[in-house]
Amino acid sequence: MGARASQEPRTRVRAGLRVLLPVLLLALLLLALVAPGAQGARGRGAADKNSHRRATSSFSQSVSSLFGEDNVRAAQKLLSRLTERFVQGVDMFLETLWKVWMELLEVLGLDVSNLSQYFSPASVSNSPTRALVLVGVVLLAYWFLSLTLGFTFSLLHLVFGRFFWLVRVILFSMSCVYILHKYEGEPEHAVLPLCVVVAIYFMTGPMGYWRGSPGGLCSPSVEEKLEHLENQVRLLNIRLNRVLENLDRSKDK
């Protein structure tokens, strides 16, 4: 009991860091996206641009003087290459998933070349069959997405164990980098994908069903087992006290 009470502040701090770190990262990304648009919309003059450039140049000069200009350039080249390869790998992965999804739709007898006909309001209202097909496609897409995410994150949780939260933060950061790289010229279009990534991040957190033990997706976690054991110990103490009280009463009589 005492050991667990001493560990409660640590677990709270860790949980707070797990939530605070991605939130801060998302806030920085949103500021980086919104700030240029807000400055352009408000019509700020050249003084703001010059101040921004001065701050950027001073920061780059300080970093170059600290680590060396050659090292900074080498690090920039390495990061750019890693980012490009990462984006290419994610594109290949998404393309593979899209091909699998198209094959599933073809197996169901849907016209993959013209999917827009199933989503038009006129065709849905005129043909109830298409409405049923549309509902089936949406449910199938939800099932396919949930199955993919569930299998991926349950495998990661099984492999990394306690460090799964760190893997989640890294994947969250890499997803944000991918989205910002894809929408580099159109930052306003990156807001919705970033929100989707944030939603997936919190869905795969402590409230997600794949945060359970490896024995099953719906099995109780370690904290629930500890709480159950505490309740059992309390019940045993209560029963033991009652037995001792009954023994004392019998002796007094």
Curated annotation (Swiss-Prot):
Residues 219-253 form a coiled coil. The keyword Transport does not apply. Keywords: Coiled coil, Membrane, Mitochondrion, Mitochondrion outer membrane, Phosphoprotein, Proto-oncogene, Transmembrane, Transmembrane helix. It is found in: Mitochondrion outer membrane. GO terms for cellular component: mitochondrial outer membrane. Pfam families: BRI3BP. The chain crosses the membrane at residues 19-39, 131-151, 164-181, 190-210. InterPro entries: BRI3BP. The modification Phosphoserine is found at residue 250. It is a multi-pass membrane protein. It comes from the Eukaryota. Its main location: mitochondrion. Interacts with LETMD1. Interacts with BRI3. Interacts with BRI3; the interaction is weak. Interacts with TMEM238L. Involved in tumorigenesis and may function by stabilizing p53/TP53. This is BRI3-binding protein. It comes from Mus musculus. The gene is Bri3bp.
